[in-house]
Amino acid sequence: MAAAAGRSIVFVTGNAKKLEEVVQILGDKFPCKLVAKKIDLPEYQGEPDEISIQKCREAAKQIQGPVIVEDTCLCFNALGGLPGPYIKWFLEKIKPEGLHRMLEGFEDKSAIALCTFAYCNGNPDDTVLLFRGKTLGQIVLPRGPRDFGWDPCFQPDGFQQTYAELPKEVKNTISHRYRALKEMSDYFIQNGTKV
């Protein structure tokens, strides 16, 4: 778990794999203790930043304390950024193979994996802080383990393996989630108790 010292922040997730990855990436330098909690949040629609802010404000209302929420997008350049923030629903219905099939008629198979962590100090009326990370890649035929979303069909630029095929130690130093968490961790370390 991220550092036990410092205050606790609720990380809103019911996804054990996501929590495991976040804790592994943050390591022991993160100055707050993350406490995972699953809560029901509305499925907002809109642009990624808008969705993250709305989710974070609603989570802060429900938790009545400091919260972090995460939103992930997978944006296909050939489709103008879709499925974007709706990737969860696409994946649920058509699986990784269907994501690849969506681009069959397009030469451009490039995609952007985007992760946004949103933090609220507990007062939903205060400013929500956003921390973003993105990784460029290609949508490929699924390869590797099928236990973590669309990882089997996203091959980051500069690699021959998909996220699913990469060792966790490698993925967790290049992924969109890593980049967003690094930005968030740096901010918390720098600002300490002022956050």
Swiss-Prot record:
Q: Which organism is it from?
A: Xenopus laevis (African clawed frog)
Q: Which reaction does it catalyse?
A: ITP + H2O = IMP + diphosphate + H(+); dITP + H2O = dIMP + diphosphate + H(+); XTP + H2O = XMP + diphosphate + H(+); N(6)-hydroxy-dATP + H2O = N(6)-hydroxy-dAMP + diphosphate + H(+)
Q: Which Gene3D superfamilies match?
A: 3.90.950.10
- Keyword Heme included in the entry's annotation: no
Q: Which SUPFAM superfamilies match?
A: ITPase-like
First-level EC class: hydrolase
Function, please? Pyrophosphatase that hydrolyzes the non-canonical purine nucleotides inosine triphosphate (ITP), deoxyinosine triphosphate (dITP) as well as 2'-deoxy-N-6-hydroxylaminopurine triphosphate (dHAPTP) and xanthosine 5'-triphosphate (XTP) to their respective monophosphate derivatives. The enzyme does not distinguish between the deoxy- and ribose forms. Probably excludes non-canonical purines from RNA and DNA precursor pools, thus preventing their incorporation into RNA and DNA and avoiding chromosomal lesions.
What is the protein named?
Answer: Inosine triphosphate pyrophosphatase
Which GO molecular function, any one, fits this protein according to its record? nucleotide binding
List the PANTHER family hit by this protein, alphabetically: INOSINE TRIPHOSPHATE PYROPHOSPHATASE (PTHR11067:SF9), INOSINE TRIPHOSPHATE PYROPHOSPHATASE/HAM1 PROTEIN (PTHR11067)
Q: Which domain of life is it from?
A: Eukaryota
Q: How is the cofactor bound, in the record's words?
A: Binds 1 divalent metal cation per subunit; can use either Mg(2+) or Mn(2+).
**Coding gene?**
itpa
Pfam families according to UniProt:
Ham1p_like
Chief localisation class:
cytoplasm
The EC code for this enzyme is 3.6.1.66
* Biological process annotations from GO: deoxyribonucleoside triphosphate catabolic process; nucleoside triphosphate catabolic process; nucleotide metabolic process
* Swiss-Prot/TrEMBL keywords: Cytoplasm, Hydrolase, Magnesium, Manganese, Metal-binding, Nucleotide metabolism, Nucleotide-binding
Compartments in which it is found: Cytoplasm
